[in-house]
Design a protein with these regions (language model features):
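Extended, low-complexity, turn-rich repeat/linker tracts enriched in Gly/Pro/Ser/Thr and Asp/Glu
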Residues: 190-196, 258-261, 294-295
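Beta-strand-rich interaction surfaces with strong enrichment in secreted/lumenal proteins
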Residues: 170-177, 238-244, 289-291
Length: 309
């Protein structure tokens, strides 16, 4: 993320923002190649507003692991630091090797999604307190489900002017099994309400977890493109614009293989993307973040599905 110069001591300890998840990858060829890169746990306290000093000021997070093989398929993993963050987790290698994953944001935001942002003032031991970034709202199409709203937030507490840090762009990140070839589909629509000239959503496929509010994600992504809402809604794929209608749900699919990704809108090819950053392990995350510089209504996100080879 954008560095907060006032959070550190100028030497080595600043703020840890990479301890809310723990991942596993496995190899079947003595470490030449790896598969999985799956979240085995997300910190149950990651969305707590008083995270930094919850139950004491000690170091904390879902990092530092040890493991024991239980049988042919199962591994017992001890992970985490702090009495309320340590866990024992049993992982099945067949789950690690799965090729598909699906989510509906209204049901799975707590269990599968990283959606918090930070109050950029250091608290406790190298920590920030948190606030919601993306939030659940009713589906405007009239169904009973909820969906995720990703927008530019109107909250001055998310700004540290002294360090020139601004975490008001809401975002969300979701993990799926890694693949150098794969297909991700997601349903979205423009939210009802006011939009600014630069309102929209940056969509990125990455090979690791980036914080939901990390506006630098696009600079390190394998593939990335924006969804623009003004002056008329469209996807911007290189120099090509693919329009879509507001007030309705749409589906985007990204089919990537090698150095290229084909982007389709509602089942029709909309354009192609060239790989911006290479990774030996392919993509394992999709990241969404607001592009607005002024408070807006943003974009709604419903379902995401992934399948890899």
């Amino acid at each position: 993320m954008t560095e907060n110069a006032t959070a550190g001591n100028g030497t080595w300890e600043d703020v840890f923002t990479n301890r809310d998840s723990h991942h596993i990858a496995m190899s079947g060829d003595e470490g030449k190649t790896w598969y999985g890169f799956r979240e085995i746990i997300l910190d149950e306290h990651r969305n707590h507003p008083g995270y930094a000093t919850l139950d004491g000021p000690e170091d904390r997070g879902k990092h530092q692991s040890e493991m024991v093989q239980l049988d042919k398929n199962r591994i017992l993993i001890s992970l985490g630091q702090h009495k309320n963050h340590r866990r024992l987790v049993i992982v099945d290698r067949r789950w690690v090797g799965a090729k598909t994953r699906a989510t509906q944001t209204g049901k799975d935001s707590d269990s599968q999604w990283t959606i918090h942002t930070y109050i950029p003032q250091k608290k406790g031991h190298c920590s920030y307190n948190r606030k919601p970034s993306a939030e659940l709202v009713p589906d405007p199409s009239g169904s009973t489900k909820k969906v995720l709203q990703i927008k530019r937030l109107n909250d001055p507490e998310l700004v540290n002017e002294k360090s020139n840090v601004d975490y008001r762009n809401a975002g969300a990140a979701w993990n799926f099994p890694n693949g150098t070839t794969g297909l991700v589909k997601f349903r979205f629509r423009a939210a009802d309400g006011d939009q600014a000239d630069d309102s929209g959503l940056q969509v990125s496929l990455t090979d690791r977890l980036f914080n939901a509010c990390d506006s630098t994600t696009k600079d390190y992504a394998l593939f990335t493109f924006p969804i623009r809402l003004r002056p008329a809604p469209h996807l911007l794929l290189g120099m090509k614009k693919a329009p879509f209608t507001p007030g309705a749900w749409h589906e985007i699919s990204l089919l990537w293989q090698g150095g290229q990704a084909v982007v389709s809108l509602d089942g029709k090819k909309a354009g192609t993307l060239k790989m911006a950053n290479k990774s030996p392990n392919g993509a394992s995350y999709i990241h969404f973040i607001s592009t607005g510089s002024q408070p807006d209504a943003g974009i709604l996100l419903d379902t995401v599905n992934a399948r890899v080879k």
